[in-house]
Curated annotation (Swiss-Prot):
Residues 129-376, 888-1141 form the ABC transporter domain. Signal peptide: none annotated. Residues 29-66, 813-831 have a biased composition (Low complexity). This is ABC transporter G family member 5. Residues 1-70, 813-881 are annotated as: Disordered. Keywords: ATP-binding, Membrane, Nucleotide-binding, Repeat, Transmembrane, Transmembrane helix, Transport. It comes from Dictyostelium discoideum.
Length: 1509
């Protein structure tokens, strides 16, 4: 049997009818209506003549109804008030709200209540909130001329000992209400009256009177639960609290929230294992309420919690409110009737206006007076949420009297409830709306309270305490820095082992000092990533006034000291003494202090970049560019003497200049240098041995005989005492960086400014209009996008076949063109029934085209004014969606995982044992059915779904899974689709492109392009995505809303035309309206397309629960306690529960009621009325339902005529088809990230101009020889920095790849090749934009016919490709971008060290030759340098750069002759160990590295999965 859409009101049992006009009497007789319906059904079975007569009668009725409806619309202004008057005496619902004594028996005398009464201050009265005519206006983010009213004439009051619930769809103004009451709104945009205990808000200390529980779970991951609570109490608690009192408060709060057993467990995050999501939500609530307050604000505190836990928490909040004298304002997403009954008042909002504010017990009666009734088994909270947005679902007046939210606002303001509210507020203009006003009230405006309960000294102390706890837990960071210190210390110490005080030793010391400096700098540079994680927590706690910015900032600086100190303590001494730096104690101490200051300077700079940048990507780019420029101008790569006057200011403002000078002065001053025989100038060649003046007569000199001379060659000519001034200079830099960081933290908050509404168009900006879409307010949509939506497009397509006996109407009958007002006039909405429909096999061929029937019909008006149904558009093509679903069976299914547990024999050791998560699960699903998997948290719902979908990557599975009677094979992915809970979608694709890509890859080649496009368009229509089909998906928070992303995710999987559809928590994070939309779509897929659907659901509403045919209910431990049908209005399972002694009451959600079967220690009513324990598992296996289900499973489940499809390949499409689709998507993805591409291009141009002008028009003097090598060396370093910037994007897209390749979209090789090939044009452009300007501005040698230029360009391009392949390899093979970026940085550092520039190859110790030859930077550097220097001749014009050689004969100096050291480019290259004949071997080596890195990337894409299930 196929279920009817729960919105169908045609079968509601009416208990009240509102007259259409004054002459018509209310119809109260249900039997008459039923007789009329039976007569109509009999008439439908008569011959054609009778049918024609009935049609004529229906036409007349419809015409009459149209006239009546028109009259009603004209009289709308008076109808609402009239209806309210007619039903003024109607009684409120006797079953809602549930009495408090029934919800919380003996709540007045339980232990918690007693503690609350004992600890409550005697003078506590709570806060009375008085809000009248409040309006808050802001400017639109995109169009500043447009003003948006987030709150519009809002009036309400709150008083102690009462809880008020706010309901409304996202964007209705709930969060703005909270921000207003929390004092977080700007007064200049606020109009109206807002009083707290009769006084205006005092922004200085208002927060001390309130507890604000936010919906985001933002905590320090390395603190335990207990430490998190204690820190919150230390910051927010009263100064008078003693240590013992704080401990008691923390223990009580943890016990209340059920966290005592986890008090010593880390909170955790994505990288640190900690408490569960539900427990984290409890921690959020706990830290918000632990300080105690006079007003409690809670924004969606139960998100992610199961119903029993939510009720447990809010029932305790109710006790705090009632007996702690604090009012509470709370918003919930999908509250149960039990939760709703805890509240005293209800506020319903829409578009910033109040649609209802009044007592909870009068709400149902109020809406019934307006013509809207809540069905008997519907949760009233869902009714309250949905009635404003979908009034036709609940109206028993047709058409509804209130059709829009403005109608409801108007009706509310004309109601008695609103008039009573205004009378109370007028009578209590002092702001205290209460019959019994307290004599003394809290007045925070009069008290001279500070902003914080504690001074900055105490705040710094507790922040320091927390910081050192975090340091002690973050042993990974310490271990990493210690390892790096020891590793690089030993590496540099042995590489520069015992450097001599000779000419080569002097130059090598400069290289060593430079590399020591960069090692410390890059170690601290990682603070950019770590500080971003801390910044989010800081923003949250700063908004809640935990501490002053200064307290946090000072503690942060102090806590950073140990890590840097430890690394310097290991690194410094090792490299200093092994490398034979100056063996003087005071110089060693200076060296160590300078390294420590360098660490702090780099740390302060990294933190500053993180504090002033909105995103981590911008911070990394900003920091890397500035860092590169400062290192370039630090005096080593480009000595001061070589820097032109136009860039010399960069030399002086670079802090690394002064670090390098300090290290150099400390090492070189007052130190004599000599020469080895081979270092004397000129060398002893036959030419130089000739007598003067032809030669030098055998005379030789040592070029540098003191450290000062060597420093002067690098432009460092400051005296020894200047090194102490360096400390002061660097201290000033540190103060400046930290000051900027401090003020950025104090005055900037990028989390608030992040646009969550930025759904951007791909095409260039058109005219922007302001709209309030279904999920997100104030979104940006172009008029072009709106025009593309056809006028007859609707969220709920009208689905009908052409058989007179069978009509499936996916719309509400109230809005359907076929709606007959006579038959439905008196439907009150009390019952939800399922309509019988013929099976697909019996339908006409046209009906056997499911998606065709979901498309809009062409309605042609007939002569009598009705619309006759025509064939759907575009039916000439074959329907590729006409297949049916598959039969899924599972028998004795078990799943277990291996875990580490304490060994009872040895408590110090862990023992491996097997944890059983699923035990002997049996069940089946047929085509056209929807199976719901339900159970409490930890029952194994998602685990079972993963096992059935074969998505588990580990664990032990036993039992049997059969699809169409056969075990799953490697081809099963062809017929199934899995909609994951986390909607991992390609952010740069549009909605339609994402669905079309899935169809192109997953549909067989027999499907033509035209058929595929039609299929995709139909899916877009079915999922109500037509209005946003050309918008980019984006990422969560900056793109489509959660509901839209969920529907797109379903569309992507539906595009494969699956026979079985698995969905994991498709309603998580959605409000009831959005959840209904999503499940409504899933229902269409199952019923109309005849697919097999298995879905896990969490707290479904009654309307959603009605969509499902079968239920598999699990209890904790993964055992079945019910598997069987639900029945009409859940009648089968409710009858089953009734036989067990469980009786449902009106307005109780059947889904919540059924879930109580899984409660541990469940007590039910026995045969004689006594209470007895229920063994749900035993009861089910002894029931008749179980026997019937097992008879079906063991019998012939699959019909004899059922045709099973067979496949001979894993993929539906060919490799080439997948490759083309992937190339197109990857290419568009890169084009649609212009920020990345443009930033890379701008960085290339900037550095090209910078380096080109730094080494502008190099000549052939002595200094130009070294400058040419420096330019080429730094250019290759820049290529490596560009590669690091590609890692985050690759890691982001890796998640999409994991999902798609697991689902069988494509071969991993097709993805890899397309990804690599589409990156080459962008690499090419980045390389060209750098090398061409640099080459010609700097004046590198172009050679004959520019041959050197083209060779150099070729080397740079393939080097860029090599670095990109290296970064890709790390991004694919390592678990996250932090580790990949770190390893990439280390790799680039080692490449720099062994590349042949810092140390020339002849100077390497023989033990390190292999490192030089393995270094991938060596080969492009050698190729480009030999290309540049071949055939070049260098001179010493006017003896510039020449070495004066005294000519001595017979002991007397007779002349001075100058020797030019570098004259031949080839000879100069030999000093670096570079050979001309290696040029083409170098090319082969570069391609070899490309092959290795790409090959490792292939292996990573194929084998590595950093996503375990």
């Amino acid at each position: 049997m196929v279920k009817q859409d729960p919105r169908d009101k045609s079968s509601y049992s009416p208990n009240l009818s509102i007259p259409i006009n004054n002459q018509e009497e209310p119809t109260l007789n249900n039997n008459n209506n039923n007789n009329n319906n039976n007569n109509n059904n009999n008439n439908n079975n008569n011959n054609n003549n009778n049918n024609n007569n009935n049609n004529n009668n229906n036409n007349k009725n419809n015409n009459n109804n149209n006239i009546k409806h028109k009259d009603e619309e004209n009289d709308f202004e008076d109808s609402i008030y009239q209806i309210a008057k007619e039903h003024e005496g109607e009684e409120d619902d006797e079953y809602f709200p549930i009495p408090l004594d029934e919800l919380m028996p003996n709540h007045e005398n339980d232990e918690l209540t007693k503690k609350i009464k004992q600890t409550r201050p005697e003078d506590k009265t709570g806060l009375y909130v008085y809000c009248r005519n409040a309006t808050y206006t802001v400017k639109h983010r995109e169009n500043k001329k447009v003003k948006i009213k987030l709150l519009d004439d809002v009036s309400f009051f709150l008083r102690p000992k009462q809880m008020t619930l706010i309901l409304g769809t996202p964007g209705c103004g709930k969060s703005t209400i909270f921000q207003m009451l929390a004092g977080q709104l700007k007064d200049k945009h606020f109009e109206g009256e807002l009083l707290f205990n009769g006084h205006p808000i005092n922004h200085k200390n208002h927060h001390r009177d309130i507890s604000y529980v936010t919906q985001d779970d933002i905590h320090v991951p390395t603190l335990t639960v207990k430490e998190t609570f204690r820190f919150a109490l230390d910051c927010l608690g009263k100064k008078e609290l003693t240590r013992e009192e704080k401990q008691v408060s923390v223990d009580n709060c943890m016990k209340l929230l059920g966290l005592k057993h986890a008090e010593n467990t880390l909170v955790g995050d994505n990288f640190i294992r900690g408490i569960s999501g539900g427990q984290k939500k409890r921690v959020t609530i706990g830290v918000g309420v632990i300080k105690g307050s006079n007003l409690l604000l809670m924004d969606e505190p139960t998100s992610g919690l199961d119903s029993s836990t939510s009720f447990e928490i809010l029932s305790d909040v109710k006790k705090f409110v009632t007996y702690g004298y604090s009012p509470a304002l709370i918003t919930l997403l999908q509250p149960s009737v039990q939760l709703t009954s805890l509240f005293d008042n209800l506020m319903i909002m829409s578009k910033g206006k109040i649609c209802y504010f009044g007592p909870m017990n009068r709400a149902l009666g109020y809406f019934k007076k307006l013509g809207f009734a809540c069905p008997s088994h519907n949760n009233p909270a869902e009714f309250f949420q949905e009635v404003v947005d979908a009034p036709e679902r609940y109206s028993f007046i047709h058409p509804p009297k209130c059709k829009t939210s403005d109608d409801f606002v108007k009706a509310y303001r004309e109601s008695d409830i609103y008039l009573e509210l205004m009378e109370k507020m007028d009578a209590n203009k002092d702001g205290i709306v209460d019959d019994n006003k307290p004599k003394v009230l809290v007045d925070s405006t009069a008290k001279e309270l500070g902003m914080y309960p504690h001074g900055i000294g105490y705040q710094t102390k507790i922040c320091l305490k927390r910081g050192f706890i975090m340091i002690s837990r973050n042993y990974y960071n310490f271990a990493t820095r210690v390892f790096k210190g020891i590793f690089f210390g030993l590496l540099l110490g042995t590489l520069y082992w015992r450097i001599g005080h000779n000419q080569s030793g002097g130059m090598e010391r400069f290289g060593l000092l430079f590399f020591i400096m960069t090692t410390i700098i890059f170690s601290s540079f990682a603070a950019v990533n770590s500080f971003f994680g801390e910044r989010k927590v800081f923003y949250s706690q700063k908004a809640l006034h935990y501490y002053k910015t200064g307290a946090y900032f000072i503690s942060s600086i102090i806590c950073d000291i140990p890590a840097g100190l430890i690394e310097v303590a290991f690194f410094g001494p090792i490299v200093y003494w092994l490398a034979n730096l100056r063996p003087v104690f005071i110089r060693f101490v200076y060296f160590m202090i300078l390294l420590f200051i360098t660490d702090n300077l780099s740390l302060s700079f990294a933190k500053m970049c993180a504090a002033i940048s909105p995103t981590i990507e911008i911070a990394n780019v900003t920091a890397s560019v500035i860092l590169s420029i400062w290192l370039l101008f630090s005096g080593f790569t480009a000595p001061k003497n070589d820097i032109g006057g136009w860039w010399i200011w960069l030399y002086y403002i670079s802090p690394y200049t002064w670090i390098f000078q300090g290290l150099s002065i400390n090492e070189f001053t007052y130190q004599a240098y000599g020469c080895k025989d081979s270092e004397l100038i000129p060398p002893r060649t036959p030419q130089n041995l000739l007598p003067y003046p032809e030669g030098f007569g055998g005379n030789q000199v040592c070029q540098y005989t003191s450290g000062e001379q060597i420093m002067d060659a690098f432009g460092i000519n400051n005296p020894d005492y200047f090194k102490w001034i360096v400390y002061a200079i660097l201290g000033a830099y540190i103060v400046f960086f930290y000051s900027v960081c401090f003020f950025a933290l104090k005055y900037l908050n990028f989390e608030d400014k992040k646009s969550k509404l930025a759904v951007k168009k791909l095409k260039k900006k058109k005219k922007v209009i302001v709209c309030k879409e279904d999920e997100e307010p104030n979104c940006k949509v172009t008029t072009e996008a709106l025009e593309r939506v056809s006028d007859d497009n609707d969220d709920n397509a009208d689905i009908s076949n052409y058989d007179d006996d069978t009509v499936i109407d996916m719309k509400s009958p109230l809005t359907s063109p076929n709606y007959n007002n006579n038959n439905n006039l008196s439907g009150s909405g009390n019952n939800i029934k399922r309509r019988k429909v013929k099976t697909p096999s019996t339908l006409s061929p046209m009906v056997n085209s499911p998606l065709t029937n979901l498309s809009p019909m062409v309605n042609t008006p007939s002569k009598n004014g009705n619309h006759s149904k025509q064939k759907p558009i575009s039916t000439s093509q074959k329907d590729i969606s006409s297949e049916t679903g598959s039969y899924l069976q599972f028998k004795k299914l078990c799943y277990a995982v291996d875990v580490k547990a304490d060994d009872p024999d040895n408590p110090k050791k862990k023992k491996s044992q097997r944890l059983q998560l699923l035990t002997d699960i049996d069940g089946y699903v047929k085509p056209g059915q929807m199976l719901a998997l339900m159970g409490p948290s930890g029952a194994g719902k998602s685990t079972l779904l993963d096992v059935l979908a074969q998505r588990k990557t580990g664990g032990h599975i036993t039992g049997e899974i059969l699809i169409n009677g056969k075990p799953p094979s490697e081809f099963t992915n062809r017929i199934r689709a899995y909609v994951e809970q986390m909607d991992v979608l390609p952010p740069t694709q549009t909605v339609r492109e994402a669905i079309a890509f899935s169809a192109r890859c997953r549909l067989p080649p027999e499907v033509t392009k035209e058929e595929r496009e039609i299929f995709v368009d139909k899916i877009v229509e079915v999922l109500s995505l037509s209005s946003i089909k050309d918008l980019k998906i984006g990422v969560l928070g900056n793109g489509l809303s959660v509901s839209q992303r969920k529907r797109v995710n379903i569309g992507v999987e539906l595009a494969s035309n699956p026979e079985i559809l698995f969905l994991d928590e498709p309603t998580s994070g959605l409000d009831s309206g959005d959840a209904f939309k999503v499940i409504d779509v899933v229902n269409k897929i199952a019923k109309v397309m005849n697919r097999t659907v298995i879905c896990t659901v969490h707290q479904p509403s009654a309307a959603i629960f009605e969509f499902f045919d079968q239920l598999l209910l699990l209890k904790k431990g993964g055992e079945t306690i019910y598997f069987g049908p639900l029945g009409n209005q859940s009648s089968v399972i409710l009858d089953y529960c009734d036989k067990l002694g469980m009786h449902i009451k009106p307005h109780i959600n059947p889904a919540d009621f059924v879930m109580t079967l899984a409660d541990e220690g469940k007590m039910v009513e026995g045969p004689n009325g006594e209470q007895e324990h229920l063994d749900a598992k035993k009861a089910y296996f002894e029931s008749n339902i179980c026997k019937k289900e097992y008879e079906i499973m063991e019998g012939q489940l699959i019909p004899d005529d059922f045709v099973v499809k067979t496949y001979d390949s894993r993929f539906a499409s060919s490799w080439m088809t997948q490759f083309r689709a992937l190339c197109m998507r990857s290419w568009l993805s890169r084009l649609r990230r212009p920020a990345i591409f443009v930033s890379n291009c701008l960085r290339s141009i900037l550095l090209a101009v910078l380096l080109g002008t730094l080494f502008v028009r190099m000549d052939y003097e002595q200094k130009d020889a070294r400058s040419r090598v420096s330019l080429l060396f730094f250019s290759f370093l820049f290529a490596g920095m560009v590669a690091i910037g590609n890692i985050p994007t690759t890691v982001l897209e890796r998640g999409v790849f994991y999902r798609e390749v697991t689902a069988g979209f494509y071969h991993s090789t097709a993805y890899m090749i397309s990804y690599v090939l589409t990156s080459y044009p962008f690499i090419l452009s980045t390389g060209i934009l750098y090398i061409i300007p640099t080459f010609w501005i700097a004046g590198l040698d172009s050679g004959r016919h520019s041959s050197k230029f083209w060779y150099c360009l070729f080397i740079f391009i393939i080097t860029y490709i090599m670095y990109d392949a290296f970064a890709l390899c790390l991004a694919v093979c390592l678990p996250n971008e932090v580790m990949a970026s770190t390893i990439c940085g280390i790799g680039l550092s080692l490449a720099t060290l062994f590349g042949g520039f810092v140390i020339a190859r002849p100077n390497y110790p023989s033990a390190y030759y292999w490192c030089h030859y393995l270094d991938w930077l060596r080969y492009p550097l050698e190729a480009s340098c030999t290309n540049e220097f071949t055939g070049l001749t260098f001179v010493c014009t006017n003896n510039k750069g020449a070495v004066p050689i005294p000519i001595i004969e017979n002991g007397v100096q007779i002349a001075i002759k100058y020797y030019c050291p570098i004259t031949n480019g080839d000879d100069f290259m030999l000093t670096y160990g570079f050979h001309k004949f290696m040029r083409y071997i170098d090319i082969a080596a570069i391609f070899g590295y490309i092959f290795i890195f790409v090959g490792l990337s292939f292996w990573g894409f194929k084998k590595v999965r950093w996503l375990n299930r």
